[in-house]
Amino acid sequence: MGMPSMPELLIILLIVVLLFGAKKIPELAKGLGSGIKNFKKAMKEDEEEVATENKKEIEEKTTASTTKTTADQDTTKA
């Protein structure tokens, strides 16, 4: 099953107009657009949060690795 063809889309549009009325369609489209916008915003915030957490983990591992290397060098010098 692929995309609906033009006659099928026209039938769907006609049914929507009959169910909701022509005046309600812009309101429905506005609500749908607002929902999509909020979803994209939440996805972006989540991606930024994950990136921040990953950066912190890398910094912690680097710090731990540097500390261990420094400690190992101190024990070999002694």
Curated annotation (Swiss-Prot):
In which compartments does the protein localize?
A: Cell inner membrane
Residue ranges spanning the membrane: these are 1-21
* Region of interest (Disordered), residue spans: 46-78
Record membrane topology: Single-pass membrane protein
User: Can you quote a single GO CC term?
Assistant: TAT protein transport complex
Pfam families, per the entry: TatA_B_E (PF02416)
Q: Which InterPro entries match?
A: TatA/B/E (IPR003369), TatA/E (IPR006312)
- Compositional bias, Low complexity, is annotated for 63-78
Show the ranges annotated as biased composition (Basic and acidic residues): 52-62
For the biological process aspect of GO, one term held by this record is:
protein transport by the Tat complex
Q: Does the keyword Secreted apply?
A: no
Query: Where on the tree of life does the source sit, at the highest rank?
Result: Bacteria
* Keyword Transmembrane helix set for record: yes
Identify the main location.
Answer: membrane
Q: Which GO terms describe its molecular function?
A: protein transmembrane transporter activity
Q: Which UniProt keywords apply?
A: Cell inner membrane, Cell membrane, Membrane, Protein transport, Translocation, Transmembrane, Transmembrane helix, Transport
Known partners and oligomeric status: The Tat system comprises two distinct complexes: a TatABC complex, containing multiple copies of TatA, TatB and TatC subunits, and a separate TatA complex, containing only TatA subunits. Substrates initially bind to the TatABC complex, which probably triggers association of the separate TatA complex to form the active translocon.
Q: What does this protein do?
A: Part of the twin-arginine translocation (Tat) system that transports large folded proteins containing a characteristic twin-arginine motif in their signal peptide across membranes. TatA could form the protein-conducting channel of the Tat system.
In which family does this protein belong, per the annotation? Belongs to the TatA/E family.
> Which HAMAP family does the record match to this protein?
TatA_E
- Full protein name: Sec-independent protein translocase protein TatA
Q: Which organism is it from?
A: Nitratiruptor sp. (strain SB155-2)
